[in-house]
Amino acid sequence: MTDADCCPFADCISQGLYLGDLRAMTSLAQAEAEEQAEWCVVTVLSERDLVGLSLPRHVDHHLVIRADDDLAVDLTPEFARAHAAIASALARGKSVLVHCMAGISRSATIAAAHLILERGIDAPAALAVLRRHRRCIGPNAAFRRQLKDLAEANAARAVPGVAEPQRGL
């Protein structure tokens, strides 16, 4: 079984990195244990959406971020943790599924943050990478601003002689 067979409701963003919706995660949860073991999952759902949800039991690692798709939600505190989980899984040769309910806003924000931190690109470039592979992405305005702030802070850290921004990103 290939990664695409196991995750039919996700789009491959780059080698081993998939962006999808809840159906992608539920498809993975129905896969055989040995197939699940080749995957790591980043779930971004509200507390309400998580109630009663059957999560994959045999994945290598599962990071659950509890967040609504709302303008008042700040995903910034989750960026470094999600990036570390994704980067670690990819370095170990695992496939990674990042998903939310629809695969449009929350999961796209987390995947874009990973690309910003991994590649040192700005927010529009990260979103363009995602959009090339998953045309329906559309982080809400607050999440887009958080990605812009992350990219600016990341760029400032990369420039010698520029004061390092506050920790927490």
Region locations from a protein language model:
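Short, small-residue alpha-helix embedded
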Residues: 108-118
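Cysteine-based protein phosphatase catalytic domain of the PTP/DSP
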Residues: 2-96, 102, 116-155
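A eukaryotic "domain-to-IDR transition" signal
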Residues: 87, 107-109, 158-159
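Intrinsically disordered, low-complexity regulatory segments in eukaryotic proteins
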Residues: 165-169
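Short linear loop/turn motifs
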Residues: 145, 163-164
